[in-house]
Amino acid sequence: MNSFRGAFLIWAVATWAETDTSWGATDEPGFQNCKNALKLPVLPVLPGGGWDNLRNVDTGRVMELAYSHCRTTEDGQYIVPDEIFTIPQKQSNLEMNSKILESWVNYQSSTSNSINMELSLFSKVNGKFSLEFQRIKTLQVKDQAVTTQVQVRNLVYTVKINPDAELSLGFKKALMDISEQLENNQTRMATYLAELLVLNYGTHVITSVDAGAALIQEDHIRSSFLQDSQSSRSAVTASAGITFLNIVNFKFEENYTSQNTFTKSYLSNRTNSRVQSFGGLPFYPGITLQAWQQGVSNHLVAMDRAGLPLYFFINPERLPDLPGPLVRKLSKTVEAAVRRYYAVNTYPGCTDLSSPNFNFQANTDDGSCEGKMTNFSFGGVYQECTQFSGNEVVQLCQNLEQKNPLTGSVSCPSGYSPVQLLTQTHEEGYNHLECSRKCTLYIFCKTVCEDVFRVARAEFRAFWCAASGQVSENSGLLFGGLFSGKSINPLTNAQSCPAGYFQLKLFENLKVCASLDYELGYRFSIPFGGFFSCAAGNPLVDSATSKDLGAPSLRKCPGGFSQHLALISDGCQVSYCVKAGLFTGGSLPPVRLPPYTRPPLMSQVATNTVLVTNHETASSWIKDPQTHQWRLGEPLELRRAMRVVHGDGEGLSGGAAAGLTLGVTIALAGVVALAIYGARKSRKKGYQALQDEKQSLAAGAAVNGDALDQEQAQNPA
C-alpha cells in the first residue's frame, strides 16, 4: 500500500512539473523563443496580411503565421514563420533609373505596383486614393506640370507565403459571424458585416513581397519646359539624374557645358521637389549612396507587393467546418461588398486636362471630353410613403412624403414622365408602454405593464420627372444643386441652397435645391442632366431609349454632362448629372469607406438553420445544438433531423402539444383537489367515530355503576 502511495506521489509531481513547463512555454510568443535560441532578428517584411488596393495601405492579418519550427532565410540572416519561404538575391540587385510621367493617368506606385495591376476588379481605380497618387495629380493639375522620377532600388529578398496557410483566428471569426447571419436568412445584417470585413481587412490579400529599400527623388517641372525640349527628352531625364546625384553626394565628372546649362534651366523650371527614403538609413542632405546602401540589410521594407482578392481565400478547403453551399454563398457576399467599395469610389468623367469638360475629381474616363451639352428641363421630384407599423405612436411619413411643387401632389406635370429612383424601407425605434392581463388558473388575474422597444417601419418611393418630349420653355424647375447630412452643396460650399431656392426632400436626408423664379434664380441655376441609381438608369442619356418605355435606361450621364454622387442610401449609390466642368474645383475627394448598408434596428426572429444539403455531392451537414458547429451527418442523424424539419405521424403539432399540456394540468389539479377533499372527509369521520365510542363507553360505565349500587344495597356489611 505504501509503495502504491509513493508511486502515485511521484506521478503527481511529474505531471505538475510537465504542466508547469508547458505553461511557461506558451506564455512567450513563438518568435521570441526563436530569437532567444538563434540570436537572430525576425524578418520584418511578411506577406499574408490584408491590403486596401484603393488606398495602398496594409490592413488586418488574414493568414495565420507561427514560429514553431524556428526556420530562417536561406542565407541564415533572419527568422521567418513556418508558412513563409524566401528567395534571396544571390547578387547585389541595385537598380537606378530616371523617367518622365507626363500624366497622372499613367501613375504607378513606387511600392505596390504589382498588386495595383491586378485585373480581377476595377483596376483603373487601384491606388487612386493613395497619398502618393493624390499628391502627384494635384501638383500636375494645379501647377500645369509633369513629373520626373529618379530612383535607386536595392532588392534583397522575395518573400512568399505557402498557398496552404490557414486563416487567422480573427478573420475566421468574422467569416463565421457572416455565415451565421446567412444561414438564418438575415441578409441585411450579413451584408453589413461583410462591408465591415472589407473595412478591417481590405480588398486583397498579399501573397508575395519584395523586401529591400529605395531612394526616390520626385520633381515637378512646368509642362511648357518639356514641350519646348521635345528634341531633348533624354536631356530632361539626364538633368533629373544629375540633380539627384548631387543630392546624395555622388561625385561625377561634368563633361559637357551644354548639359550644365540645361540642368540649370531644368532647376529654374522646377515647381516642386522631394526625396523619399523607403528603408535603409533615413535620408538627410549630403548622405552618400554608399552609406545609404550599407544600411539596407538592417532596415528592410516592402518594395513591391503582389496578391489576390480577399474573397479568393474564402473556400471550402480553408473553412472545412462549414457546409460547401454556405461557404460559396459567404464568398459571394464578401465579393459583392468588395465590388461595392470599388463602385462607390469610382468617379467617371473627362480626364483630359486640355478639354473644357475636364473633371478634376474623375479617376476614370467616361468619354465625356468630346460631348456637347443639351439643355434638358427639370420637372421636379416627389416622394411617396406608406407606413406599415408604429403609426399609432410614430408618424414616419410626415418627414418622408414630398409633393412636387409643379403639381402640388405626388405626380409629374404634363409632358414629363416619372422615373422611380429607389424603393426602400425606413425604420425608427421607439419605446412604448404595453399592458396585458395575466391570470393564474383563470382565477387570479392582474394587469402587467412593460416598457417595450418596438420598430416603426415605412416604405418610401423616390421619383424625379424627366421630359418625355418637347416641353415649353421655362416650364420646369431651376436646379440649384443638392446636399445631405454628410455632404455640402458644391454651389454654395455649405449645407444650404442658393438665394431664392427652396429645398425638396428626397430619400431620408437628401435636399434638392429648386426654384420657380426664372428672373432672380437663373444666375444660380445649373444645367441639369438627370438622376440615376443602382436600381434605375437615366432616360436622358438617349432620346430613343427614353421614348421606348420597355427599354432599360443606361446608368450614366448624357454627353457634355458629368456625374456626381448625391448620396449612398442604405448601400445604393444615387448620382446626378450636371454640366461637365462644374463642381470640379477644390481638392480631390477622400475615399468613401464602408459600411454603406444600415444594420437592422431589431433583427427579426431568425430561423435556426440545422440542416444544409448539397445536391451536387449528395452530402448533408447538421448543426450541433450544443456546440453550434457544423459536421457531416450520419444516416441516422439525417433521418432524425428530417423528422424534426418536416414532421411525421409520430409527433404532435404545437397546438396538440399545448392542448395536451393544458389537459394534463387540469387533470392533475382535479386529482389534487379530490385528494384534499378525501383527506378532510376521512378526518371528520374519524372524529365522529371517536365521539360515538366515548359516548358508548360513558353509558356502559353508568350502567355498571347502577348495578354495583344495587348489589351493595342488597348485601349490607
Swiss-Prot record:
Site label Cleavage, positions: D352, L353, N357, F358, N359, F360, R631, L632
Protein name: Macrophage-expressed gene 1 protein
Record PANTHER family: MACROPHAGE-EXPRESSED GENE 1 PROTEIN
Residue ranges of domain MACPF in the record: 30-345
Physiological role: Pore-forming protein involved in both innate and adaptive immunity. Plays a central role in antigen cross-presentation in dendritic cells by forming a pore in antigen-containing compartments, thereby promoting delivery of antigens for cross-presentation. Also involved in innate immune response following bacterial infection; shows antibacterial activity against a wide spectrum of Gram-positive, Gram-negative and acid-fast bacteria.
Disulfide-bond pairs as recorded: C34-C70, C350-C369, C385-C397, C435-C449, C439-C445, C534-C572, C557-C577
Domain of life: Eukaryota
SMART domains per UniProt: MACPF
Glycosylation: residue positions: N185, N269, N375
Keywords: Adaptive immunity, Cytoplasmic vesicle, Disulfide bond, Glycoprotein, Immunity, Innate immunity, Membrane, Signal, Transmembrane, Transmembrane beta strand, Transmembrane helix, Ubl conjugation
Annotated stretches, region: P2: 413-656
